[in-house]
Amino acid sequence: MKTRTEKDTFGPIEVPEQHLWGAQTQRSLHFFAISTEKMPVPLVAAMARLKRAAAKVNAELGELDPQVADAIMRAADEVIAGKWPDEFPLSVWQTGSGTQSNMNMNEVLANRASELLGGERGEGRKVHPNDHVNRGQSSNDTFPTAMHVAAAVEVEHRVLPALKALRGTLAAKSAAFYDIVKIGRTHLQDATPLTLGQEISGYVAQLDLAEQQIRATLAGLHQLAIGGTAVGTGLNAHPQFSAKVSAELAHDTGSAFVSAPNKFQALASHEALLFAHGALKTLAAGLMKIANDVRWLASGPRSGLGEISIPENEPGSSIMPGKVNPTQCEAVTMLAAQVMGNDVAINVGGASGNFELNVFKPLVIHNFLQSVRLLADGMVSFDKHCAAGIEPNRERITELVERSLMLVTALNPHIGYDKAAQIAKKAHKENLSLKEAALALGHLTEAQFAEWVVPGDMTNARR
């Protein structure tokens, strides 16, 4: 393997010739060969967007030669476009400030910008990773800025559209099934009737609440740490740098980014990400509930509830011929569990900052972005391959309604709770219908039973 010599303050080190990274990235590869988790692609893109904005603003403020700034911006555009995916190989499990990943970006952009200016990589390059690409910045403010940019963009462009689409599918099902009377269930036991549409409307409302909660967290994610530099004082950054870079990122992404009002907090803690992930966890809890309900309602086909049918997507067993399983529901419940686990890790990371810097940043953003991707992809998959194909099994629904003892609840206002309970117990013990038990006990007439026990009427009682 051909190499070239790169240098940092620790001295020279050999770097693979074909790669754009430099000395600090190479040292990180050596000292942090830990597991397989790499810095998330959305974070890399966010860091490139930040470096592009910083170069542009530094040039406007007279802090950077315009030609150098232009080359850095062009190099950053290539990274944003996904041209150099193999140049960002560092593990999540590195320094807690993300310094190595900040320098990875600085080195790649410096070497590539040098090439764009007709120069070379390495010692003779025309663009310096620290003096030019990182000008007016510290890893301590760039990394948390990239965290917020990546988190906000991914939530806005992945999670919310997927949530909206699934919500629309379920709302359409709720409207289509609104007149189908079915038996309700509480404590996994029979309860009074409702309609299938009413039941699904509860799922729609859960998703509406989740969307409201997620949107409420975006204002915090839009506040950026850039300009705080090392400890929040803004040392070595132009006084206008923070506001201008934030405005440039807002223009670039379409998100409402602004300079954080207190840079000390922005470097030392991550409440905005904890708050936002809490909303994602709430969405995960709702999705787990919905998916569990769907697979219970579709259980069978002959020995379960069987009130609905869901798409049959693939064989379900390697030994039982013809078996089909609710696999989309299972995938959603698993990913929801992972998001809940991620929330614990993010909470620990967010609570573990000391003095002027939180040093769990890679952990926090790795888990956050994994949750975003899981939820977004999971909702798209569940919507397309399960929810869109939900259909009612009307005969089975009617059968279960007619067999339910809890229809007796409609008699409470007419004969009282105690007599109604006697009817239900007699029917259950002697395997009678409610009507047969009621007439045998003499608590009401056949005409009264027909008038008072109407499942459809019970779904709209006292509304």
Curated annotation (Swiss-Prot):
This is Fumarate hydratase class II. Its EC number is 4.2.1.2. SUPFAM superfamilies: L-aspartase-like. CDD domains: Fumarase_classII. Transmembrane segments: none annotated. It is found in: Cytoplasm. Belongs to the class-II fumarase/aspartase family. Fumarase subfamily. The record marks E330 as: Important for catalytic activity. InterPro entries: Fum_hydII, Fumarase/histidase_N, Fumarase_C_C, Fumarate_lyase_CS, Fumarate_lyase_fam, Fumarate_lyase_N, L-Aspartase-like. Its main location: cytoplasm. Homotetramer. There are 2 substrate-binding sites: the catalytic A site, and the non-catalytic B site that may play a role in the transfer of substrate or product between the active site and the solvent. Alternatively, the B site may bind allosteric effectors. The active site is at H187 (proton donor/acceptor), S317. It catalyses: (S)-malate = fumarate + H2O. Keywords: Cytoplasm, Lyase, Tricarboxylic acid cycle. One of its GO terms (molecular function) is fumarate hydratase activity. Pathway: Carbohydrate metabolism; tricarboxylic acid cycle; (S)-malate from fumarate: step 1/1. GO terms for biological process: fumarate metabolic process; malate metabolic process; tricarboxylic acid cycle. GO terms for cellular component: cytoplasm. Residues 121-142 are annotated as: Disordered. Residues 121-134 have a biased composition (Basic and acidic residues). Pfam families: FumaraseC_C, Lyase_1. Substrate binds at residues 97-99, 125, 128-131, 138-140, 186, 318, 323-325. Involved in the TCA cycle. Catalyzes the stereospecific interconversion of fumarate to L-malate.
